Amino acid sequence: MEILWFIPTHGDGRYLGTQTGGRTADHLYFKQVAQAADRLGYTGVLLPTGRSCEDPWLTAAALAGETSDLKFLVAVRPGLMQPSVAARMASTMDRLSDGRLLVNVVAGGDPYELAGDGMFISHDERYKATEEFLTVWRGLMRGETVTYEGDHIKVENSNLLFPPKQSPHPPLYFGGSSQAGIEAAAKHTDVYLTWGEPPEQVKEKIETVKKQAAKEGRTMRFGIRLHVIVRETEEEAWEAAERLISHLDEETIAKAQAALRRADSSGQKRMAGLHNGDRSKLEISPNLWAGIGLVRGGAGTALVGDPQTVATRILEYQALGIESFIFSGYPHLEEAYYLAELVFPLLPFQNERTKKLERRLGEAMGNDHFARGKKAKV
């Protein structure tokens, strides 16, 4: 099991839909979140990509020097980046971070945003371009001299002079719910990512991807992208969830949903279909809450509950075949601590940093002794 956190380079706060309780999204805050995740034992952090975010490569490079063990899941963008340039960027980042790079392959899902970046090809053509990109990128990272001509990419005698730290290259993560996306993932990538859908839908998707990978003679790992709201009691957790969206009015929700409907991403459509913009039907599966998706693109669901309940839901996904969990929560600094301190001890997730959490003592009682801890069980 690996557990990643999230660097909120598109903004953060205590509430959605208002500047009340908002936080300045700058390097100092990103560093706080990254260093907390590093100290708490998270495997790594995801950096989002797109016009509403700070550049993920520059942000990851800045944070790598502020952390020691934390890995960085950073996006390459086929169609917006040439594979040779992306290979040099990834190789440099992997070497300078001493092998702490993970690569997120993002084909894009919003034609309006992509047009602003100069990309005008259709949904399925984007995945063809992605396959061409990865054919060249992987060859370069393996140390090959690549000559290739496809419908979207052409290179002659391209090579990489400085190899990455990880061999043959950093792991490739990929999410795509359409058939074209699944085919691209099965041919080229290492970890297939799904949004936080109900377990029965996740199970179906995993089976589909496994079959496609088998046709390619490959096996894959699987990951899931979720928010989390965990508190010491169920009541506190659900109160926190309702408080998070307490400033959202119907006009704000409608405007956000209209913007999200521009997307031609199958995954985004599946996310929107979980709630259809209706705030009265947000618990779509036990402890799986779709409130964040009322106004947020991409990951729109959260596990909500007390530590035992959240751990149980995580283990249910693990039983389906999920190995990589990518979480986030509002505000990201505080929720990183809630998840690590309350839930990590209940999971089969350990490293030298999480072991330090188990040795925490709290404050001395009466300047004389430390309280004895009690470990909950799932």
UniProtKB/Swiss-Prot annotation:
EC number: 1.14.14.5
InterPro entries, per the entry: Alkanesulphonate_mOase_FMN-dep, Luciferase-like_dom, Luciferase-like_sf, SsuD_RutA_monooxygenase
Organism superkingdom: Bacteria
Enzyme superclass (EC): oxidoreductase
One of the protein's GO biological processes: alkanesulfonate catabolic process
Keywords, in A-Z order: Flavoprotein, FMN, Monooxygenase, Oxidoreductase
Catalysed reactions, as listed in the record: an alkanesulfonate + FMNH2 + O2 = an aldehyde + FMN + sulfite + H2O + 2 H(+)
GO molecular function: alkanesulfonate monooxygenase activity
NCBIfam families, per database record: alk_sulf_monoox (TIGR03565), PRK00719.1 (NF001939)
Task of the protein: Catalyzes the desulfonation of aliphatic sulfonates.
Family: Belongs to the SsuD family.
Name of this chain's protein: Alkanesulfonate monooxygenase
Organism: Bacillus velezensis (strain DSM 23117 / BGSC 10A6 / LMG 26770 / FZB42)
